[in-house]
């Protein structure tokens, strides 16, 4: 896989857990805490992934989602979820035409 090769070349292959397969099924098997999640899968499934992963992401953790600013996107429910949840803070990067959403799970106030 290209991702595995890139992680190795970057020297982080021992720090990254790469999960391959049906994401809707694989995500159910994950355990937290998770520091960073990168979602690049079926766009209709992003909200499902968020709902399953958010409880596992540690406070201060990041959720990166590919293609979040795609015009005519099928991800309106996901976008609404990450921009209206008070526990999250989201910015959008437009390095590519379809953008990447970067969502921070806020730390709990002490």
Where are these regions (language model features)?
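S-adenosylmethionine/decaboxylated-SAM
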Residues: 1-110
